[in-house]
Amino acid sequence: MTTDASNKSIKDVLRVYRQSRISAPIVYDSPHSGIINPPDFRPTATDSQLKTARDAFVDELIIDSSNLGAAVLVADFPRTYIDPNRSKSEVDISIINGKWPHDVEVTKKLDVGMGLIRKYILPNVPMYSKKLTVSEVENRIKNYWSPYHQSLQNLLEEKLSEFGSIFYINWHSMKSKGNQ
């Protein structure tokens, strides 16, 4: 199966897999499997530290379910760049150089540095050596977070319209032990 504009994939941002000949009331997404670093992603965290945040190979586990009629959405960008599983208002203003002009939602994840854009890659290990600009954060939301959410919304609405009810599973992996 191809992943081109005909099924709404966006190069280096997201992939959508689905069959046109068979359909099932299932939508899967893998928001944390991405490994394609955007050109403006310049963390001070090491590659091995960045890999700790990835749900490695989860996308590979679920892609073939599209052959049975499921719609599958995969993020190609890393969650360490911007996390599609966070609210776009879950912004840590302490990592931004300038005044953030949008609403902010304070959550437990944000409090530990793991909001929409991470402050820490691991507990007390900074992600960046300098603050991000307001426009950098806004561009991440516009070019990565929003298209991912729009694609997910479109898939959910299409399947719901077709079947009346659906199964939606947001796929992740877990470490056998925490960040040690």
Go through the PLM ranges and name each one.
Residues 2-168, 174-180:
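N-terminal catalytic or cofactor-binding beta/alpha core of small enzyme domains
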